[in-house]
Amino acid sequence: MAAETGTAKPARAKKEPQPLVIPKNATDEQRLRLERLMRNPDKLAAIPERPKEWSPRSAPEFVRDVMGSSAGAGSGEFHVYRHLRRREYQRQEFLDRVSEKHNLDDDFQRKLMENKKLEEEKTAKRRLKRQKLKEKKKMAKMAKKEEKKEEIEKHVELDNSPESSDKSDLEDQ
């Protein structure tokens, strides 16, 4: 009937059936995700934000009623005291962990700098050694060239000497 009235809906484009692929390892899984993303490059990829690190509530600046665990406190007060104490212990433990992490990071950075300095020293030492060897080879090459040049000059002198010309004159006769 819809065809008769002229208000027919256009046919929806069917999606191509995708073969079922089960990733065997992490690289296959990554490849499949990338292929899926690249099918429609205009669509924005969802990048999850990093979860915030847990931190305890800050300690109150002013506590109006300071309670203790003494025998004079009522039973309701003890629970309040216990919760406050637990929160304070959590806060102190958190601060200790942050401090420890900071110390470890500083030690790591210091160690990295020491290693980098040692590597640079080794590299400089090796570079100097290479340069010395290169210079030594260059000097040997120059000495060999000079020696060859002197030898050629010696031969030229012998050829131009009067004794050699006398010998050649004798040979001509």
Swiss-Prot record:
Subunit details: Component of the pre-catalytic and post-catalytic spliceosome complexes.
The protein's name in its UniProt record: PRKR-interacting protein 1 homolog
Family: Belongs to the PRKRIP1 family.
Annotated region (Disordered), positions in chain: 1-27, 115-173
Annotated region described as Required for RNA-binding, given as residue ranges: 50-142
Family annotation (InterPro entries): Prkrip1
Region described as Required for nuclear localization: spans on this chain: 125-137
SS bond list: none
UniProt GO BP: mRNA processing; RNA splicing
Subcellular location: Nucleus; Nucleus, Nucleolus
UniProt keyword list: Coiled coil, mRNA processing, mRNA splicing, Nucleus, Spliceosome
Compositional bias ranges of the Basic residues kind: 124-142
Organism: Xenopus tropicalis
Pfam families: DUF1168
Purpose: Required for pre-mRNA splicing as component of the spliceosome. Binds double-stranded RNA.
Record-level GO cellular component terms: nucleolus; spliceosomal complex
Coiled-coil regions, chain positions: 99-161
Residue stretches of biased makeup (Basic and acidic residues): 143-173
Recorded GO MF terms: double-stranded RNA binding
Record lineage: Eukaryota, Metazoa, Chordata, Craniata, Vertebrata
Gene: prkrip1
